[in-house]
Amino acid sequence: MGANTSSKAPVFDENEDVNFDHFEILRAIGKGSFGKVCIVRKNDTKKMYAMKYMNKQKCVERNEVRNVFKELQIMQGLEHPFLVNLWYSFQDEEDMFMVVDLLLGGDLRYHLQQNVHFQEDTVKLFICELAMALDYLQSQRIIHRDMKPDNILLDEHGHVHITDFNIAAMLPKETRITTVAGTKPYMAPEMFTSRKETGYSFAVDWWSLGVTAYELLRGRRPYHIRSSTSSKEIVNMFETAIVTYPSAWSQEMVSLLKKLLEPNPDQRFSHLTDIQNFPYMSDMNWDAVLQKRLIPGFIPTKGRLNCDPTFELEEMILESKPLHKKKKRLAKREKEMKKSDSSQTCLLQEHLDAVQKEFIIFNREKVKSDFNQRQANLALEQTKNNTEEEEDGQNNNL
């Protein structure tokens, strides 16, 4: 499936925007909200990434372009050890691309489906790492709104990383959100009763953390909610159902989960300090957590892809527009567009042209390089000013 077979890495202009030709496509590994995901290698640095690609025409037809743009906007401003971070975004005539951290440990949903039994100490560390990620998002005024095992990836050492910001929301200060979005079994009670006057805030992500932690420990969720369950039934369930906790779990873990699964958002644990100050976490070295120096109790199997192998078959056999045939397809498409003059084709092209114009190109390497250069220039300028001040002082003393 590789796009480049040459042993000699091509030379790219440093000032050129990163594009599809800068990567070697290795294999498909999954599906995102609006597209598919594959492993890629950057030709110049040989670094490995995950590349998510979204077909523009499908996004236009499903009215999903704005969601993609919003996700890009949010991810460009984020960087944290327990997030899946964006490195590049670019486009061609057919697709929009997001190149992110490659995490080969699989998502937590995959491991649950493989009947992995997560021990309490493992889940305890997961809670700490995810709490640090949520605290960072909160500091950036971001609500994820879709925290669940499917959107938590493991790296090769077993540390967790939050991904998929497709329905995340930016929350201006002194405001609350009223729009309903998320995956029902993980949505907080206040999201189902949200009104314009009340709304909801960051606490919804901490409820999702509680549901996820419970599910990892028990293999099922605390409430029997499905995507087909009506909002009315869910509200009634929150008011009447009693969450049970196995006797094998420590009382400290049960107490923590109860704080996260508190129906009243004002009383729910919803800050990192709530977790840090909880007696159960008194033995936790939080600097070591942030620096990933604590060894998780579950480490994904090395030497294998922790994902559904059918994704590769879909890409190679079933996919109507496989990525490895992109160049030929784009050349053919250009010829067909020149021949076609139907009003429907013209309208679609107008929308695609708008996407092309408004798409946000991003290069984290360049952003970091520019920042480091500015810092170096400032340091040089400061040194120069200090030297001049010292010389002026010496002259004044003469």
Curated annotation (Swiss-Prot):
| Coiled coil segments of this chain | none
Catalytic activity as recorded in UniProt: L-seryl-[protein] + ATP = O-phospho-L-seryl-[protein] + ADP + H(+); L-threonyl-[protein] + ATP = O-phospho-L-threonyl-[protein] + ADP + H(+)
Q: What membrane topology term does the record carry?
A: Lipid-anchor
| Cofactor(s) needed by this chain | Mg(2+)
- One GO CC annotation, please? plasma membrane
Nucleus as a keyword of this entry, yes or no, is no
For the Protein kinase domain, which residue ranges apply? 23-281
Q: Tell me where it resides.
A: Cell membrane
User: What name does the UniProt record give this protein?
Assistant: Serine/threonine-protein kinase 32A
Gene symbol of the encoding locus: Stk32a
